[in-house]
Swiss-Prot record:
Reported function: Methyltransferase required for the conversion of demethylmenaquinol (DMKH2) to menaquinol (MKH2) and the conversion of 2-polyprenyl-6-methoxy-1,4-benzoquinol (DDMQH2) to 2-polyprenyl-3-methyl-6-methoxy-1,4-benzoquinol (DMQH2).
UniProt name for this protein: Ubiquinone/menaquinone biosynthesis C-methyltransferase UbiE
Lineage: Bacteria, Pseudomonadati, Pseudomonadota, Gammaproteobacteria, Alteromonadales
Gene designation: ubiE
Superkingdom, taxonomy of origin: Bacteria
Annotated source species: Idiomarina loihiensis (strain ATCC BAA-735 / DSM 15497 / L2-TR)
Gene Ontology BP, a term: methylation
EC number: 2.1.1.163, 2.1.1.201
Amino acid sequence: MNDKNEESIDFGYQKVARNQKKNLVADVFQSVAAKYDVMNDLMSFGIHRLWKRYTIDCSGVRRGMKVLDIAGGTGDLTAQFSRRVGAEGEVVLADINDAMLKVGRDKLRDRGIIGNVRYVQADAEELPFDDNTFDVITIAFGLRNVTDKDKALRSMLRVLKPGGRVLILEFSKPVSATLNQVYDFYSFNILPKMGQVVANDSDSYQYLAESIRMHPDQETLKSMMEAAGYEKVDYQNMTGGVVALHRGYKF
Ligand SMILES: C[S@@+](CC[C@H](N)C(=O)[O-])C[C@H]1O[C@@H](n2cnc3c(N)ncnc32)[C@H](O)[C@@H]1O
């Protein structure tokens, strides 16, 4: 019998049993949650804010809409969606990790973002929502960490309303060889040291660099989305392909 859980799967460059990956990923985000935002700003020189703003601009979000920000973590996208959907709309910030959710919830409440945001602990692979619930779904820097990405893509499509769109913001493959070299040097020599100094945790940032290299490239992810049933799938590279924004629709 072919038991899926006995197959091995990548956790960064390591091969681990399929049913171990969730716990290992949980350990990473449990460990980095408190320093997650400050590390994001440092590591990306603040550029992650532009990637996220562009994602919102491409989402087509309007007042009154219902949005799911899955793997939403500390809530950067949720905060912007909350303003755009207004009091008649709703944003669900969902994440598998309670520590990340707590940091997100505290941050948004401190900023006065309340009333139209709901917090749900959920796994992207098995979303606990009815079919055809959301107008817009985002997953930013989250899909890379999911064990069964195809299952997560199908789960997101199921809860998306007809006419709605899913946006996947994720690290991808730089388009130029030179940029790739610089990026590799930065990721493997500088990032883990930064993680050690700021978050007292170099392993999690080593995992970050490795998991990015193991993630499907632009065209592969596009094919995976099409295979899952998304229509009119496209993507746009940002920062030379360091990051890509994939978009797919349900009609
Ligand atoms: C790198 S953070 C991204 C947070 C936020 N979206 C952002 O862009 O700043 C990745 C998040 O994915 C969450 N995550 C990992 N696996 C998940 C899964 N299977 N389902 C839902 N969330 C998951 C982690 O807990 C973490 O909060």
